[in-house]
Amino acid sequence: MGSIEIPNCSGSLVYKTISDFIEFPNHEQKLWWHSTAPMFAEMLRVAGYDLHSQYKILGIFLNHVIPFLGVYPTRINNRWLSILTRYGTPFELSLNCSQSLVRYTYEPINSATGTPKDPFNTHSIWDALDRLMPLQKGIDLEFFKHLKQDLTVDDQDSAYLLENNLVGGQIRTQNKLALDLKGGNFVLKTYIYPALKSLATGKSIKTLVFDSVYRLCRQNPSLEAPLRALEEYVDSKGPNSTASPRLLSCDLIDPSKSRVKIYILELNVTLEAMEDLWTMGGRLNDASTLAGLEMLRELWGLIKLPSGMRDYPEPFLQLGTIPDEQLPLMANYTLHHNQAMPEPQVYFTTFGLNDGRVADGLVTFFERRGWSHMAQTYKDSLRAYYPHADQETLNYLHAYISFSYRKGTPYLSVYLQSFETGDWPISNFGIPVAKPLRSNISDPDR
């Protein structure tokens, strides 16, 4: 009997073709490419992106995003730790399974990140935006500029935090970018974390976020009604609630079309808590919300999140560590123009759960929805991303699963570990070169 061939994303034709012709400017960028591009290329192929789009997307990633990922992470080097993953790595792929759309998120890092010039990585995002804006029509920074000014630290704030030693083990990430890939084009989004601004000003994250968005409503009054409804729900939980605002995001497009999303972290990991997030404590009770609630309950039964109180863990996990933890729940609320109520999206925090069982639950959900291609390819894709891993024991591939329901249609996305994929474990890429080319990216402080 012949052996069963294991799918392997390092065999991707697009990845191999591009790799044959690249001259990397430094060793760090070479490592980032060979660590992440095999999985990226395979995900695009299986999702049905045409060949031209695959090359364009990976070309943009190679030339305009990888230069902003910083030094390549190892267990011993000094690097900027990003909130994006529990391992502090600044890049993550995700897949909208209902629409077969790929997205990636990254925290831009440059040579000043973590140095006295930019100790909390406030400024590097501007350089990253300068690289992306010429590549895609329609990018608009009006909302971003407003929210960033209100919710991230300036140089004076940074000096105050450092002089008074206020940060400690606090998360230092303040902003990230995400590209939703539609054909060969992309829609740009930003995520903003106000935790450091809260430390610097003494104001709560809730106060900072809602005050900033209310000021945004002065020029965009069509967003005020859903914002007020969300604030009333958050306030109704009281000062000792296990749920609290954590971050927000917005689309970097025409302000009249941009959506603002406010994210709530819920420490109480139970189906009842998730149902409360979904219905905003019963405030959302229309037919669409209730239909989505039934699917949410179905997903809960399939994924089997263990119930309990979960603080967000500190510190970051060391690379290579097998997680023995579970994260809190999360939800976001989209503020749509001219809608009275926000639209919920909930997150099943699956990091630390057995990935095989999570995949089994997802495939069952896909089959019940009639997403036959996704159901047939999903497990093979996971094996292709990490062909040398023990697929029976993995518990760190699925970081989150998000779920929303709009106009009779469920939307589900998976957020996946995207680091050292394909043949990386048996390659020479991770072996330090004897005399590496000097990187133009310095090792930032932690």
From Swiss-Prot:
Residues holding substrate: 103, 189, 191, 259, 261, 263, 345, 347
GO molecular function: tryptophan dimethylallyltransferase activity
Gene behind this protein: dmaW
Record protein name field: Tryptophan dimethylallyltransferase
Keyword line: Alkaloid metabolism, Transferase
Family of this protein: Belongs to the tryptophan dimethylallyltransferase family.
EC number: 2.5.1.34
Transmembrane segments: none
Subunit structure: Homodimer.
Pathway: Alkaloid biosynthesis; ergot alkaloid biosynthesis
Gene Ontology BP term (one): indole alkaloid biosynthetic process
Cross-referenced NCBIfam families: arom_pren_DMATS
Binding site for L-tryptophan: 83-84, 92, 193, 246
Keyword Transferase: yes
Function: Tryptophan dimethylallyltransferase; part of the gene cluster that mediates the biosynthesis of fungal ergot alkaloid. DmaW catalyzes the first step of ergot alkaloid biosynthesis by condensing dimethylallyl diphosphate (DMAP) and tryptophan to form 4-dimethylallyl-L-tryptophan. The second step is catalyzed by the methyltransferase easF that methylates 4-dimethylallyl-L-tryptophan in the presence of S-adenosyl-L-methionine, resulting in the formation of 4-dimethylallyl-L-abrine.
CDD domains on file: PT-DMATS_CymD (cd13929)
Source organism per UniProt: Arthroderma otae (strain ATCC MYA-4605 / CBS 113480) (Microsporum canis)
Reactions mediated catalytically: L-tryptophan + dimethylallyl diphosphate = 4-(3-methylbut-2-enyl)-L-tryptophan + diphosphate
